Amino acid sequence: MNLEILTPDKKIFSGDVYGVQLPGIGGIFEVLGKHAPIVSALKAGKLKILKDKNATSLYSIQGGFVEVMNNKATVLVEGVKES
């Protein structure tokens, strides 16, 4: 699955990943490859990139949205910093 994390100022991350864990309004959820299309609001919290089944990267995000379509997840956030 391809993942992009974008802020209004710049691209934070772009690359192929196993999946991503996101802080949704209703709770934490995970998106893996070939996920059904979805658009969801995100609240401030931790975003975890699952690079493979063992390696992860963690980011603190401010609110935003995620769109998943055609095996690509695009995360649009107000602000982000690597944890």
Positions of predicted regions on the chain:
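Compact, glycine-rich, soluble single-domain proteins
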Residues: 2-83
